[in-house]
Design a protein with these regions (language model features):
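Catalytic active-site module of serine/aspartate enzymes centered on a nucleophile-bearing elbow/loop
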Residues: 243-274
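Short beta-strand/loop motif that positions the catalytic acidic residue
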Residues: 213, 219-221
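Conserved acidic catalytic loop of the alpha/beta-hydrolase fold
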Residues: 89-106
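Conserved alpha/beta-hydrolase catalytic His-Asp/Glu region
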Residues: 143-144, 148, 158-212
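Flexible "cap/lid" loop of the alpha/beta hydrolase fold
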Residues: 119-124, 130-159
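Alpha/beta-hydrolase fold catalytic core
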Residues: 1-41, 63-66, 268-274
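Conserved HGGG/HGGXW glycine-rich cap/lid loop of the alpha/beta-hydrolase fold
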Residues: 27-80
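Acidic catalytic loop of the alpha/beta-hydrolase fold
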Residues: 224-228
Length: 274
């Protein structure tokens, strides 16, 4: 008998949601909303995912009494295709969506590229944010020393590698073929046009800008993240006031998907202390 090399976590049944496409004037964005009277937690997806990528977090947040909200940015599953020549501003799109949903203040949980836009939103509309959870994100920081670290980490050919190699840990890919297939299916559905659309930020994000943020902040990454390894997470945390940080074992750039039980425990513990 071959010993088990991974203990897979099945994707749980999803909580009931209200789905819709919000007409925000300049664009239309797909969203789902578990509703209820709990504090809103808004999930900002990675560049390879969409609103549908939070399959492990949606039911966990709803079961814990939160109003979980996911949405797809322009160009992603269910939302307007978007125009590469005018991709819009992600902070303004999110602001319009929260107004549409009647959300006065939210906890933002953002993965990877979603972290760029969560930070930009917190800088642009600080009163609308209660807390920030930023996961495995480069944060869009433009400081030259920080950019140089990224260039050392990821040589030019890195962008040509398969997305699962870039984003999922070797341990996960080796041990969980069903999970890998599920991740591929979510990625394939996330970008119907096949090309990612990258919206603008309101601010040129720098460490000096991050140091002005005073929201309670949780930072997480995987120990095998090729974008944001633990040493880079420590660098980020040093520039964020009072930031709490955790490194998740046997996870890469998608710890919320690779190690959902650990991720959800850390997230819910953080939210429960606010």
């Amino acid at each position: 008998m071959t010993p088990a090399i991974w203990d897979p976590v099945p994707i749980p049944p999803q909580a009931p949601v209200r789905e819709g496409v919000a007409d925000l004037g300049g664009t239309k964005l797909y969203f789902w909303d578990t509703g209820g009277t709990g504090h809103p937690v808004v999930l900002l997806h990675a560049a390879t995912q969409s609103a549908m990528g939070w399959v492990y977090q949606q039911p966990a947040l709803a079961a814990a009494g939160y109003r979980a909200i996911g949405y797809s940015r322009r160009g992603y599953q269910g939302s307007d295709p978007g125009d590469p020549a005018e991709p819009g501003c992600a902070a303004d799109d999110l602001h319009a969506l929260l107004d549409h949903l009647g959300v006065a203040q939210a906890d933002l949980v953002a993965a990877a590229q979603g972290g760029f836009f969560a930070l930009d939103y917190a800088l642009t509309y600080p009163g609308r944010v209660r807390s920030l959870t930023v996961v495995s994100s480069l944060m869009g920081i433009t400081d030259p020393d920080y950019v140089a670290i990224g260039n050392r980490l990821r040589p030019p050919f890195f962008a040509t590698l398969p997305h699962d190699f870039q984003e999922l840990s070797p341990s996960y890919r080796a041990g969980n073929p069903d999970g890998l297939a599920a991740w591929h299916a979510l990625e394939h559905a996330a970008i119907p046009g096949g090309k990612r659309l990258t919206p603008k930020t309101r601010h040129r994000l720098t460490f000096a800008m991050l140091e002005t943020i005073r929201h309670p902040t949780l930072l997480m990454t995987g120990d095998s993240d090729l974008y944001t390894p633990p040493s880079l997470l420590r660098m980020q945390a040093a520039h964020m006031f009072g930031a709490e940080m955790h490194v998740i074992a046997e996870a890469g750039h998608s710890p919320y998907f690779e190690q959902p039980l650990v991720f959800n425990r850390l997230l819910l513990d953080f939210l429960g202390r606010l």
